Amino acid sequence: MLQTLQAFPNSKVLSKWLEVRGKRLENTSGTEASILNNPLTPNHSSLTTKSDEKPFPIEGEGLGRGSSFHLGMAGYTFNKFDIDTTLAFMRRIDVHYLCIKDFHLPLDADADQVAAFKAKLAEHNVVGYAVGPIYMKDVPAAEKAFAYAQRVGVDLVVGVPGSWGDKSPNYAVLDRVEQLVRETNIRYAIHLHGPDMSLYPDATSIWEDVKDRDPRLGICLDIGHDLRYGSDPMRDLKRYAKRVFDIHLKDVTAPTKEGKAIELGRGIIDFPLFVKLLRKVGYKGSVSLEYEKDMSDPFIGIAESVGYFKAVMQTAQ
């Protein structure tokens, strides 16, 4: 606990974090509570146990003063867990927006599978607000991704026009994506990956490729990766606000490739300033935690990060 307390230099944020954490534990019983208290708990199977409690209302997230955006989860966070575990844990931490990954709902899912998946989300009071990130190695892959988004019923695809190892964007794919955006009225946000990937390492590299295209092509601003590349995510949010359609929350230990993912509030990103800026630019999308530390046992870090960010949202003036 001492290490956690030292991560909060702002006493107002600390007190609000403790309040939020306390309320979550009051509503958490048995093994779920032990998981939140003990990061070494090896068995997460109880998270899939159906609870008798009613889902938390989406409107009751306590997002703070003047917020027009939603706190969500990037599905990649749960890449080692099934959708039942994911949704049960999201209920426990009172987060209700999910960017859907294809390991939870396959790209070739048919109408019946999509309907069953959406019913499961609704049971847990979770909204699937987007799909992705989806890598699009060629035009057929782009067409498949947009058909998938239509079946799921979302208005945003987070993607990359190319493959992980590509050195430059696939402009044939991007051209087709622009056509698909016009045909479907589904927006497209290119995800940046910092210094780990040649394609679109920061927000500016995306901006250069979308600025003269349909305004429904934009940016998924991963603030941790943007910073690790040496860019300034605060500056980029201000510069490109009208084209930022999705945001992935991360904190990191250094503004370099060697920077590692860490719980929100323990790294070098100024989250009170970030929240103030989100409000100033009028951002209206989702702000989704993509937690990439301890991905085989992430629950305590996710809970801490969500509690911290909610506290910042309630205290940032």
Where are these regions (language model features)?
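Active-site beta-loop-alpha junctions enriched in small/polar residues
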Residues: A74-F78, K101-L105, P133-M136, P161-W164, ...
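Hydrophobic faces of well-ordered beta-strands that scaffold small-molecule active sites
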Residues: F69-G75, L98-I100, G128-P133, V157-G159, ...
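Arg/Gly-rich low-complexity intrinsically disordered repeat tracts
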Residues: L14-G30, S34-L47, E53-P55
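Active-site groove signature of glycoside hydrolases
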Residues: A149-S168, T184-P195, S288-L289
